[in-house]
């Protein structure tokens, strides 16, 4: 039990610094990393070479993920600066006069789509202003997308969270997708219901249960099949697109309740056709499909890979980490590379169509730096912390202590606590 308590200190440190001391994630993560190193050396017998190896693996995993993050941000800002995101938002807003359904489509469906495209706060940053402009309260405008997109995090943004899960656990993705996708599909329904509840409680949910079931069902099924057929990098994106298509169909037949007709809000003229606004994401889907299902393309893009080989290492307490290679990065076939190709094509397309002002390249890069740097700085120490804990046997100590606590009559309670532990890790 002593090892269990010691191994929990890094997590306790992050919680205390972020909740009580109001530190940012990057600063708190760095402090917790320092605590982890001290514990690993003095209480778990981790040698210096193990710490170096663990941190090097953490950097490699961070590079794998950050390649996606930065490329996704570049693509998003290239589309946003052209007006594509606003065009998509306006198109959704014009689908129906039903206020709760507008909230569901924007705060749930469109937010899920944006999570599939970019993630990292983008759904809230984009959807909240749209909802404010439609007359929703500030609290509702922020809360709806914050709740609505959360089910799509694992397979959203090119499945960066899922890739991190695979990298940290070493479990093949094919063994994780089935139950993950089922649970997320059910969570998606609950997220949609929660968004409706925000606007009018259970009465609003009852009145919109048919659109909710249809839209959430379509998104859940599409995500399930994409994930289980090995294309989990597109799971969140395709689910979002399917949800948008389902929303368009549903609104054709759905008549708003007289009490819930939304007020008309003045809007500026829409200069960009919807199909033009969707071009970046259609291009991206084509590129990913070719890179995944065309063997010649997959082989060509995957030729040049960057990885590092790490030797076996062990703690003084006998905890052994076998020799292994870091998660390889296919320089030209990595999901981040596909996003960069898409960004380049989209930028050229929008430039030729006259949607950019002077200085657009500098503006996109500045916005990317502003959004990407905090994420990058915070990610490296936290991933390093997780791998150091794993290599020093601290994660095993947590699992062993947890198994001891949730044993016997308390074993049934563990599935209830497990999601909270996962949220804590996130």
Task: Annotate the PLM regions.
Residues 98-129, 133, 153, 376-388, ...:
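Hydrophobic alpha-helical transmembrane segments of multi-pass integral membrane proteins
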Residues 6-15, 23-44, 66-72, 212-216, ...:
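Hydrophobic mid-bilayer segments of alpha-helices in multi-pass membrane transport proteins
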Residues 4, 61-65, 92-106, 134-140, ...:
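Membrane-interfacial loop-to-helix junctions in multi-pass transporters
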Residues 100-112, 138-151, 172-192, 408-422:
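Alpha-helical transmembrane segments of multi-pass membrane proteins
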Residues 50, 54, 78-96, 173, ...:
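Flexible loop linkers connecting adjacent transmembrane helices
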Residues 134, 146-252, 272-275:
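Membrane-core helix-loop-helix motifs of multi-pass transport proteins
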Residues 262-418, 425:
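Transmembrane helical segments that form the transport core of multi-pass membrane transport proteins
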Residues 1-9, 62-65, 117-123, 174-189, ...:
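Structural signature of hydrophobic alpha-helical transmembrane segments
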């Amino acid at each position: 039990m002593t090892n269990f308590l010691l191994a929990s200190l890094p997590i306790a440190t992050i919680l205390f610094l972020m909740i009580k001391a109001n530190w940012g994630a990057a600063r708190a993560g760095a402090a917790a990393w320092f605590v982890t190193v001290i514990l690993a050396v003095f209480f778990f017998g981790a040698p210096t070479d193990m710490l170096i190896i663990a941190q090097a693996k953490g950097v490699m995993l961070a590079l794998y993920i950050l390649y996606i993050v930065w490329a996704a941000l570049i693509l998003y800002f290239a589309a946003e600066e052209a007006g594509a995101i606003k065009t998509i938002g306006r198109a959704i807003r014009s689908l129906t006069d039903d206020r709760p359904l507008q909230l569901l489509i924007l705060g749930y469906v469109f937010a899920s789509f944006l999570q599939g495209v970019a993630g990292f706060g983008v759904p809230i940053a984009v959807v909240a202003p749209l909802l404010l402009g439609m007359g929703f309260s500030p609290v509702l405008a922020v809360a709806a997308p914050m709740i609505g997109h959360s089910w799509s995090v694992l397979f959203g943004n090119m499945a960066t969270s899922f890739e991190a899960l695979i990298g940290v656990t070493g479990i093949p993705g094919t063994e994780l997708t089935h139950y993950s996708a089922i649970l997320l599909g059910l969570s998606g329904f609950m997220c949609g219901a929660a968004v409706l509840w925000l606007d009018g409680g259970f009465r609003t949910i009852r009145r919109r249960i048919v659109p909710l079931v249809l839209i959430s069902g379509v998104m859940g099924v599409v995500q399930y099949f994409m994930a289980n057929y090995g294309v989990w990098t597109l799971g969140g994106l395709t689910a979002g697109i399917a949800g948008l298509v389902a929303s368009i169909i549903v609104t054709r037949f759905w008549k708003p309740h007289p009490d819930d007709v939304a007020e008309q809000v003045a809007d500026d003229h829409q200069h960009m056709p919807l199909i033009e606004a969707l071009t970046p994401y259609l291009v991206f889907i084509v590129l990913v499909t070719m890179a995944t299902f065309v063997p010649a393309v997959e082989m060509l893009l995957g030729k040049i890979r960057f990885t590092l080989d790490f030797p076996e290492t062990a703690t003084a307490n006998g905890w052994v980490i076998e020799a292994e290679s870091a998660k390889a990065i296919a320089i030209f076939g990595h999901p981040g590379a596909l996003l960069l190709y898409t960004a380049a094509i989209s930028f050229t397309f929008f430039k030729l169509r006259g949607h950019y002002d002077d200085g657009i390249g500098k503006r996109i890069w500045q916005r990317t730096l502003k959004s990407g740097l905090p994420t990058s700085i915070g990610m490296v120490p936290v991933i390093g912390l997780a791998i150091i804990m794993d290599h020093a046997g601290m994660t095993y100590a947590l699992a062993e202590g947890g198994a001891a606590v949730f044993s016997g009559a308390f074993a049934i309670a563990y599935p209830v606590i497990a999601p909270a532990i996962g949220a804590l890790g996130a």
